[in-house]
Amino acid sequence: MVHHIVMWKFRPEVEETDKARRKAEMEKNLSSLVGKIPGLLSASFVKEPIASSTHDMALVTTFEKAEDISAYSIHPEHVKVADTYVRPFVTERACLDYQD
């Protein structure tokens, strides 16, 4: 199993009142990719990190093998979701992948 964790910060121009809606849209659409993209076994979304966190939200995914992360990143369904619900609203991205 390979785990892929991605964290983001909102762009400064995203209104505080809009952040909860944006997080909900990200969660719904990123989670919907399970079953659509080969090798993607699970996805969970962190909408409410604790105060000591450096990022506003995170996606935690599990894949069968490391190669599946590369295929996921360019899969048309993932690109569509990222281009519509994630990239327009985030400014900073951090990623950590690990195998257990």
Identify the role of each PLM range.
Residues 1-56, 64-74, 97-100:
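Short S/T/G/P-rich N-terminal loop/turn motif that feeds into the first structured element of a domain
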Residues 66-96:
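C-terminal structural segments of small proteins and small subunits
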